């Protein structure tokens, strides 16, 4: 992804599980990761962002 691209990160915590979703608003592609609720939000956000980058590259055929 380009350095200037906007990404939204959403967190949902339910019980002892946290779900982080990275969303690219330009394409509408979403990537979700799950982890323990006590995991650092930065770690979950980074994992979701990396998964989103992977999915976007896969979609582009690279």
Question: Model-found features: residue ranges?
Answer:
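Amphipathic, hydrophobic secondary-structure cores in small proteins
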Residues: 4-59
């Amino acid at each position: 992804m380009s350095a200037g691209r906007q990404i939204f990160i959403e967190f949902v915590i339910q019980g002892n599980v946290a779900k982080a979703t990275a969303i690219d608003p330009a394409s509408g592609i979403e990537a979700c990761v799950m982890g323990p609720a006590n995991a650092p939000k930065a770690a979950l956000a980074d994992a979701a962002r990396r998964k989103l980058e992977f999915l976007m590259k896969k979609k582009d055929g690279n």
